[in-house]
Amino acid sequence: MRVRRRKGAKEHLENNPRYVILKPEEVKGHWQEVFGNDHPIHIEVGSGKGRFITGMAAKNPQINYIGIDIQVSVLSHALDKVLDSQLPNVKLMLADGSSLMHYFADGEIDLLYLNFSDPWPKKRHEKRRLTYKSFLDTYKKILPEKGEIHFKTDNRELFEYSLASFSQYGMILEQVWLDLHASDYENNVMTEYEEKFSQKGQVIYRVEARF
């Protein structure tokens, strides 16, 4: 989804190295040192404007979080939320989901979130979907044995595609929600898009899948 370009976004990121990891390839294998503790590390690929990642970090101070996005303007909005919250357990980085193995060592990440990823509905764009096999190959490397992906979307076609992709890869579908907001799931933290879509009456789908 295209986002309006934000003036000064790049400089905003560069001026806040406490929260934005500008050269993540240089800290590969040393993320615990970045956070200054040995707490588990969870990442969100496609973190958008940061509502989810900051919400999770506030609820779970015993876990470290990294929000990852490929769009400079979007990540700059996430940085605003991080600066407002002053949370010590959240970092941000500008990166593509297909390159994560360059920034994280094998098994360095404990859990991975995918929230409202671009569905790339056209067949010729299938390889761009964040639940395509090549992405799963990458996620498997940086997650531990039996590591988990928590995936959430409002797009039924992408959800069904992702369930099939996970299953064909040999992953276990631990829990599946066909209408998250109508369920008794208590630990949900909404993204900006999730609130917008749910207010329009759209169903939200969620799955927890394990390698």
Curated annotation (Swiss-Prot):
Its EC number is 2.1.1.33. InterPro entries: SAM-dependent_MTases_sf, tRNA_(Gua-N-7)_MeTrfase_Trmb, tRNA_methyltr_TrmB_bact. The active site is at D118. The keyword Ion transport does not apply. S-adenosyl-L-methionine binds at E44, D69, D96, D118. Pathway: tRNA modification; N(7)-methylguanine-tRNA biosynthesis. One of its GO terms (molecular function) is tRNA (guanine(46)-N7)-methyltransferase activity. It catalyses: guanosine(46) in tRNA + S-adenosyl-L-methionine = N(7)-methylguanosine(46) in tRNA + S-adenosyl-L-homocysteine. Residues 124-129 are annotated as: Interaction with RNA. Keywords: Methyltransferase, S-adenosyl-L-methionine, Transferase, tRNA processing. Substrate binds at K122, D154, T191, E192, Y193, E194. One of its GO terms (cellular component) is tRNA methyltransferase complex. The keyword tRNA processing applies. HAMAP family: tRNA_methyltr_TrmB. Belongs to the class I-like SAM-binding methyltransferase superfamily. TrmB family. PANTHER family: 3-DEOXY-D-MANNO-OCTULOSONIC-ACID TRANSFERASE/TRNA GUANINE-N 7 - -METHYLTRANSFERASE (PTHR23417), PENTACOTRIPEPTIDE-REPEAT REGION OF PRORP DOMAIN-CONTAINING PROTEIN (PTHR23417:SF14). Catalyzes the formation of N(7)-methylguanine at position 46 (m7G46) in tRNA. This is tRNA (guanine-N(7)-)-methyltransferase. It comes from Streptococcus mutans serotype c (strain ATCC 700610 / UA159).
